């Protein structure tokens, strides 16, 4: 499977197999079953993964949408047919985060169907009549009124070159869906804000249809003031810090949780309410926060370092180290507009000299050929 990796390189003759390795954003796993790649996660004694709690975030996104429906029950059903219809932009059918978010939405809205490996996360194509086997019609009760909920359409947003999570494909999809489904579309849902904003800008804002995404990208957070329904912050500020902090600690040979669970000399430390560590999976997970009209002003700058870990390390005790870091899909909106800018701010604070390599989201050779 394709994964985003960051490898640290020191001067000297340390073999690559012994250098610290931190996977981030995309957890090494089987793209079909979602099973973790334990071999990749145990490459050596200084190998870790940094991401976010995908299931907790998926549940939050689903709950956010269900709560919105209940709060706007008098206006949400645009054509008054008693069916709350939604369309869903799926980022990557083989990506664990995409799978979790699709499942979270379907679970919260009652449209989920259980399969042999849990809730079915496959796209339905079009499902105007409710006959698709991948989902079922759900129900939501609001003050004595029962609404049916139907997934009218969903597809993986993969472009002709094979890149997934593609905003352009999502924009084309919403145009096609709007043409065939019209005012039966009451809600637009996306696995991320990149696709969500593409659909919001091309159709749903003009038509007053609430759109929900994921990632709390700056443009999506700002768009909440203009009718974007909401998004989920995966605490990218915490993730980016963890990604580089683990490398810093491994390179320095100090306790791996220095500046994480325990304060470093500069006072950097994370509290347990923003992350946790799963030892069996060798994975650090940031916790998610729902961003809605009630709190979006607190999230307007998605590239601001997290306050409790924004203290500069002393260069005399933490001298400059060199790191090779690749981003598997540099065209991805979240990775390019939020994650990398955060990394670039933390690399200065942590005295790391980083060589950033952007991949095309399709072939590993696009990155490894530049090693």
Where are these regions (language model features)?
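Exported/periplasmic ABC-transporter solute-binding proteins
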Residues: 183-190, 201-273, 285
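Hinge/cleft segment of the Venus flytrap/periplasmic-binding protein
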Residues: 83-84, 89-90, 97, 109, ...
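Beta-alpha junction/loop-to-helix N-cap segments that form part of ligand/metal-binding clefts
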Residues: 1-40, 48-52, 193-200, 360-371
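Extracytoplasmic "Venus flytrap"
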Residues: 1, 90-99, 187-193, 321-349, ...
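Short beta-strand elements at the ligand-binding edges of bilobed clamshell
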Residues: 33-67, 88-92, 226-241, 356-358
């Amino acid at each position: 499977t394709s994964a985003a990796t960051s490898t640290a390189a020191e001067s000297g003759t340390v073999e690559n197999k012994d250098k610290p390795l931190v996977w981030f954003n995309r957890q090494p796993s089987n793209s079909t079953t979602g099973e973790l790649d334990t071999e990749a996660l145990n490459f050596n004694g200084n190998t870790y993964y940094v991401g976010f709690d995908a299931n907790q975030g998926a549940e939050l996104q689903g709950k956010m949408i269900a709560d919105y429906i209940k709060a706007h029950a008098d206006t949400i059903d645009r054509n008054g047919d008693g069916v709350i219809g939604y369309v869903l932009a799926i980022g990557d059918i083989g990506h664990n985060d995409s799978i979790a978010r699709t499942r979270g939405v379907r679970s919260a809205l009652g449209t989920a169907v259980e399969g042999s490996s849990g809730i079915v996360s496959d796209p339905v194509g079009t499902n105007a009549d409710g006959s698709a086997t991948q989902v079922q019609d759900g129900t939501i009760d609001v003050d004595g009124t029962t609404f049916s909920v139907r997934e009218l359409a969903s597809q993986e947003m993969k472009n002709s070159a094979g890149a997934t999570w593609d905003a352009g494909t999502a924009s084309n999809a919403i145009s096609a869906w709007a043409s065939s489904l019209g005012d039966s579309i009451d809600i637009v849902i996306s696995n991320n804000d990149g696709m969500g904003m593409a659909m919001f800008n091309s159709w749903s804002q003009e038509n007053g249809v609430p759109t929900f995404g994921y990632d709390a990208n700056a443009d999506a957070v700002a768009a909440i003031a203009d009718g974007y329904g909401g998004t989920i912050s995966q605490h990218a500020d915490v993730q980016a810090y963890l990604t580089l902090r683990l490398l810093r600690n491994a390179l320095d040979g100090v306790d791996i949780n220095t500046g994480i669970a325990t304060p470093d000399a500069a006072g950097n430390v994370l509290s347990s309410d923003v992350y946790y560590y799963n030892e069996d999976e060798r994975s650090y997970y940031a916790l998610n926060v729902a961003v809605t009209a009630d709190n979006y002003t607190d999230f307007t700058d998605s590239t601001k370092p997290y306050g409790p870990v924004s203290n500069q390390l002393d260069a005399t005790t933490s001298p400059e180290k060199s790191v090779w870091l690749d981003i598997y899909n540099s065209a991805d909106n979240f990775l390019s507009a939020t994650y990398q800018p955060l990394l670039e701010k933390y690399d200065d604070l942590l005295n790391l000299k980083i060589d950033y390599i952007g991949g095309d989201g399709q072939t590993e050779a696009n990155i490894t050929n530049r090693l």
